[in-house]
C-alpha cells in the first residue's frame, strides 16, 4: 500500500541537512547513510549517496528517474548465488 498523499515523503532529518548544506556550497561529495527508508526527493539529484546494505556502503548516483523511490531499493541486501547443485554421489 502506498503512503497517503496527505503526508509528506519520509526523508531522514540528518540526510536532508547534509544535502541542503552541500547544495548551498554547490559541492558534490559522497554522503554516507544507513537510512534505507528515506524517499528520494528532487533536491538529491546529482549527489552520490552511499547506502548501507547490511555489510558495506554502496555508492549510488541519484538521477531524476529515481525520484519517488526509496534509497533501499538501489542497494540489494541479499546475494542469491543459485540453488545447490544436485550431488548424487554423496547420496550413495
From Swiss-Prot:
GO terms for cellular component: chloroplast; mitochondrial small ribosomal subunit. One of its GO terms (molecular function) is rRNA binding. Component of the chloroplast small ribosomal subunit (SSU). Mature 70S chloroplast ribosomes of higher plants consist of a small (30S) and a large (50S) subunit. The 30S small subunit contains 1 molecule of ribosomal RNA (16S rRNA) and 24 different proteins. The 50S large subunit contains 3 rRNA molecules (23S, 5S and 4.5S rRNA) and 33 different proteins. uS19c binds directly to 16S ribosomal RNA. This is Small ribosomal subunit protein uS19c. The keyword Ligase does not apply. Belongs to the universal ribosomal protein uS19 family. One of its GO terms (biological process) is translation. Component of the chloroplast ribosome (chloro-ribosome), a dedicated translation machinery responsible for the synthesis of chloroplast genome-encoded proteins, including proteins of the transcription and translation machinery and components of the photosynthetic apparatus. NCBIfam families: rpsS_bact (TIGR01050). HAMAP family: Ribosomal_uS19. Keywords: Chloroplast, Plastid, Ribonucleoprotein, Ribosomal protein, RNA-binding, rRNA-binding. InterPro entries: Ribosomal_uS19 (IPR002222), Ribosomal_uS19_bac-type (IPR005732), Ribosomal_uS19_CS (IPR020934), Ribosomal_uS19_SF (IPR023575). It is found in: Plastid, Chloroplast. S19 alpha and beta forms differ in pI. S19 beta form is the minor least basic form. Transmembrane segments: none annotated. Pfam families: Ribosomal_S19 (PF00203). Disulfide bonds: none annotated. Its main location: plastid. PANTHER family: RIBOSOMAL PROTEIN S19P FAMILY MEMBER, SMALL RIBOSOMAL SUBUNIT PROTEIN US19M. It comes from the Eukaryota. It comes from Spinacia oleracea.
Amino acid at each position: 500500500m502506498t503512503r497517503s498523499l496527505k503526508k509528506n515523503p519520509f526523508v531522514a532529518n540528518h540526510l536532508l541537512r547534509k544535502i541542503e548544506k552541500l547544495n548551498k556550497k554547490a559541492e558534490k561529495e559522497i554522503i554516507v547513510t544507513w537510512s534505507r527508508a528515506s524517499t528520494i526527493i528532487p533536491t538529491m539529484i546529482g549527489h552520490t549517496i552511499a547506502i548501507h546494505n547490511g555489510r558495506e556502503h554502496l555508492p549510488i548516483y541519484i538521477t531524476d528517474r529515481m525520484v519517488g523511490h526509496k534509497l533501499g531499493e538501489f542497494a540489494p541486501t541479499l546475494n542469491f548465488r543459485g540453488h545447490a547443485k544436485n550431488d548424487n554421489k554423496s547420496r550413495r
